[in-house]
Amino acid sequence: MKHFSTETEKDTVLFKTPFSPLYVRCALKNLKSTRILCMTALLCALCALIDIFYLMIGGAFLRIYFSFLVAGLLCMISGPFLAIPAGFLVDTLSFLFSGGDPAGYFPGYALSSMLSFLIYALFFYRAKLSLSRLFAARLTVNVLINVILGSVWKHILYGNAYIVYFISGAIKNIAMLPIEAALMLILYRRLVPILQRMRVIPGSVEITVQRRDYVFSAIAGVIGVAVLIAYYVYKNR
């Protein structure tokens, strides 16, 4: 186990995985930090507000939301223990800001939001960030939460076959992955230095991009566009 001579040195350490006693202590420390709590509350409100807006492509075929960008930043700052209640708060506020859903408030979406925030925190909190890591985090959320769990919730609420929601959700979420990862990279590279000056994330956090990341992103982008076009043509033939 590595020992740190000063508290400052401990506050700047990054972790390869969250499975460390020091990682847990650092995350728990955020529960007592006024600065972190205030920033988390502010980003919760911003995330919920942005969540009610979206871009629509191809009629009702594809909706592009941007709240995941704020959610990732929030979890990068707050850590896993704050991220879970933050996810619940964001879902509740989003429901209220949007004027409610005709089907009423559904707790399944609150669970999805809490799990999504936890995943982002495990990937981003006190970690060395890269395009591959951003892509992996978004892939995990898209597949496990948006596709698998989301299809269950839609089946419960609207009654159509699970496989119908699963197939359409999988195609849309996988096709959007390269774009979403690129947006995260562009935004976070601009905002990380600002957050460091605000002292809400360690100064040692950085975002690196290697040549293989560009190659991987290009391939993923081509596949995503091809899948999206093929599905759109199939649905409108």
Regions found by a protein language model. Name each.
Residues 68, 72, 110-117, 177, ...:
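Alpha-helical transmembrane segments of multi-pass membrane proteins
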Residues 78-79, 90-98:
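Interfacial segments of multi-pass membrane proteins
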Residues 44-48, 90-91, 113, 142-143:
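Residue-level recognition of pore/gate-forming positions within transmembrane alpha-helices
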Residues 2-77, 81-82, 86, 102:
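Hydrophobic transmembrane alpha-helices
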Residues 48-52, 72-73, 92-96, 118-122, ...:
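Alpha-helical transmembrane segments of multipass membrane proteins
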Residues 84-89, 108, 133:
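Hydrophobic alpha-helical membrane segments of integral membrane proteins
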Residues 88, 92, 186-187:
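Hydrophobic transmembrane alpha-helices of multi-pass, membrane-embedded glycosylation machinery
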Residues 4, 52-66, 99-107, 124-237:
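Membrane-embedded alpha-helical hairpins and interfacial helices in multi-pass inner-membrane proteins
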